[in-house]
């Protein structure tokens, strides 16, 4: 983990907790007490936190920003950031987007926060962030809370047509020439009901997922309008997807 990543996580801890001890930083980041104190000193010198005895406090004048605590530990984080930035450029002012769960989903929502677009989501970490940042238009899909995924799931057979959007952004555990695969069946089935009422389906997966097949087939390749992935994605799979009408964007 780089120094910049440590600093970001430390600031995220302060945003949630308001105060952290050196011991808590050591435990969370897996670093030595000396390194933890150095990080606190540097952030204190730059005015990003208030150094106190045996720890640090959040700067009260700054509005705390909520974000998943493990966001920077997500696999292929930098690539996912590029994917999210590219995806956010597709949406025009006044349009509505459906964003589902996961680290890439959160990164995309963060990119779109503050823009004149309506964000529809069942991912509570993202919804909390958008509300905290006072995003103008947020729709939270109702249903039963699923703790393992931090999402709400509506009962089987219920209508989700009220949540139609111009765009639907989703990801999964694997993408082949057959289509997109997801491992959580409840989540996948809830999202599948929306495929017929969204304008365009855009799949966001990092390059390590291309060619992988895991879980259930969520959507066939011919249902996918666009794929945004990394530059190291398997070119053979990408060619097969393009042949089926999928637009490919590598970042």
Swiss-Prot record:
Residues 20-39 bind DNA. InterPro entries: Carb_Metab_HTH_regulators, DeoR-like_C, DeoR_HTH, NagB/RpiA_transferase-like, Tscrpt_reg_HTH_DeoR_CS, Tscrpt_reg_HTH_UlaR, WH-like_DNA-bd_sf, WH_DNA-bd_sf. Coiled coil: none annotated. One of its GO terms (biological process) is negative regulation of DNA-templated transcription. GO terms for cellular component: cytoplasm. GO terms for molecular function: DNA binding; DNA-binding transcription factor activity. Keywords: Cytoplasm, DNA-binding, Repressor, Transcription, Transcription regulation. Pfam families: DeoRC, HTH_DeoR. It is found in: Cytoplasm. Residues 3-58 form the HTH deoR-type domain. It comes from the Bacteria. Represses ulaG and the ulaABCDEF operon. This is HTH-type transcriptional regulator UlaR.
